[in-house]
């Protein structure tokens, strides 16, 4: 994958565990969505799963190259704290990925986990786990305030890029 010697990918989820249950028993049975600290993962019927199924059917990836892990709230919180102790400030979603990776790694293996959100988006979680004032909101984001959904550019944001519509 991407020219890297990747043995497997881990589909890490929070308590909304439809994919891991399906991977284990072959039954696609979405349950009611459970609110969690990693709220962007609060999806009980992920609409991107058919893409994975298609890649499997085409032989692009093999079943043995995909693992699944469910990370509960306590483990997510532990991940935030552990990563902080390692000098990395993580938000809950990356902490889910980190804890899943820690469980899956075999002796002698190395791994990579990915996260895309900034910890400042989760002030309640960060303060509860690491204390007040740990996460600094970048000045440019604090000054900008919330974005609208109409594609307007921020005032003063003249960097030559076009606004994106959502």
Label each PLM-derived region with a short phrase.
Residues 1-166:
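PLP-dependent amino-acid enzyme catalytic core
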